Amino acid sequence: MTLVKLFFFALSTLGTFELLRLAGRNRIQTHFLPSLTIAVQVSVLFLAGLWNLLPEAAGILYLLGFFGLFLLVVREKSLNFLRKYADFGYAAFLMILMGSALAVKGKMFLQYDNFSHWALVVREMLRFDRFPNFADTLIHFQEYPLGSAAYIYYFAHWVGTTEPLQMLAQAYAIAAAILPLFSRVTGRKPLCCAALLGFAWFVFDYNTAITDLLVDTLLPMVGMCALLFAVTHCKKGCGKFELFCAACYSIWLVQIKNSGIFFLLPIVLVIVPYAHRQKAWGACASVLLAPLVSLVLWQKHCAYVFPAAASTTHAMTLSNYQATLQGKSAEEILTICRSFLTFALTYRGLWLTVVFCGMLGGLVFLLNRPMRKDFIRIALFSAGLYLVYQLGNLGMYLLSMPTVQALRLGGVERYTKTVLLAILYLNMLPMLRLISDTPVKSRALALTAGFLVTLFAFLYLNLGSLEAIFQGREDPAKRQWLESVRVEYGLPEGESYRVLLPAEAANDRGYTYVLTRYTFRSNSVQVLTEDDLGSLSADDANFLLIYGTQSPAVSAWVRTHYPDQAGRPVINLWLE
């Protein structure tokens, strides 16, 4: 049944491709259609979610795709329009999707941040068919945008709500953002197809895992895809439809994550000169203002549906920034700045990226003189992007992140890899052009092939983990145990749970807390060790879950207080 639903979803999506192509009068490059479709759909779903019309909008978008497909078949009286998708770029795209489907098959969410927000918010949206509001007390990061969650909701709403399908939806969005790289390919397409596959594999392995709904990989892919769209369609001359598309990309970008605004700046630098030359400020205002208006609307929505949204962690409000900064002493601020700057300038991944780009630049200067200026522009832009994005990250640690997390630079490597992925995306453009455009001379071709193989080997051996994306990164034991006892003992949602960890797992309290909270949809969760058993007698909890082998002290406590439940991993605390 899932395959049938996926087939019909693909038909609807294909129909939307064609509607956008017709609306743009064939001016939109074909390789942008998958990502552009998502950008338009997310923009519509975002507005619909604000009006509490999420399922209605999902239905309209789905049916609109079938209408587009029907309209095209009737007009052309054939399926010849499919030929435009029969190229090596789309072949790579399909292979990426098939590999992604195999990678997520049978997987479950395991990483911490899935349970604290990213997977949690998608599950709640699917359950209630709306954006979260005051009734969703499980949602802690209330001002986090829902750009990625909105598309996963749309995909899962029609295909299936299982966790692997949610992962596949995110993988599809990432692959759709990678595909436009092929728009610059003119020759040697089989080799470029292989290069695109290799890059996609690296992208799914480098930062966040393909089995996560975290957006630190999606964000740079969408940001650079949107920039490439602006350069391709809006730099020299474009119509209102192209500007509308750029506006949708911009809305999608800033609604993925707050830091998406830093990837919006390059798009503005492309649009503003065009608006100045063509005296088209009115038409270009949509691209410049639409994402900012969407941010304002989102903040107004959060303030309306979450009474305390303005003071939650990472809320984009002056009051929250002021309170967070005032919570740090001058010495702590200085320590954070020193630690961050040291990391930003000495991070191994940064300098390996510099070496990689330098090797690629050497190849460009040696073999393809016309590309030299373009490569220099990319290099300068990459340096500027890294500087601006890292300054934004430093501001986040000072103004938005709690002191304890900021002092240990929580998540700094993941955030840095976000901007490095954007830089590597940009450098794939000259790499693909080298493969595509280098003159057919045996020596030059052999040199190009040899260097590119070396570059990719360097990329994988030094920047990636070389860990197969099919194996996963996290230990599933704890989640599998929780799911098994939930099913075996029929444990209900929303009750009060206590989880007892063995002493050697005491450092795992935080993960166990968010996992238990996610599993049982409960706000009343505490994680205990043997030393805390005495407090249970005065606690009004419902269930005690005992993880791992019971120690003699735990077994004795259970026999004393709950003799009829001795030896069980689940103790009903309401039964004496």
Where are these regions (language model features)?
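Signature aromatic-anchored transmembrane alpha helix within multi-pass, membrane-resident enzymes
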Residues: 239-250, 268, 282-292, 431-464
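Extracytoplasmic catalytic/substrate-binding loops of multi-pass membrane glycan-assembly enzymes
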Residues: 107-121, 127-151
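Membrane-interface alpha helices of multi-pass inner-membrane proteins
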Residues: 43-49, 241-258, 263-269
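Membrane-embedded, lumen/periplasm-facing catalytic core of multi-pass transferases
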Residues: 452-512, 518
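Membrane-embedded, hydrophobic transmembrane alpha-helices
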Residues: 1-83
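Perimembrane helix-loop-helix junctions
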Residues: 70-84, 263-289, 365
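Membrane-lumen/periplasm interface segments of specific transmembrane helices
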Residues: 100, 105-109, 151, 273-364
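Hydrophobic/aromatic-rich transmembrane helices and adjacent perimembrane loops
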Residues: 123, 215-223, 262, 403-433
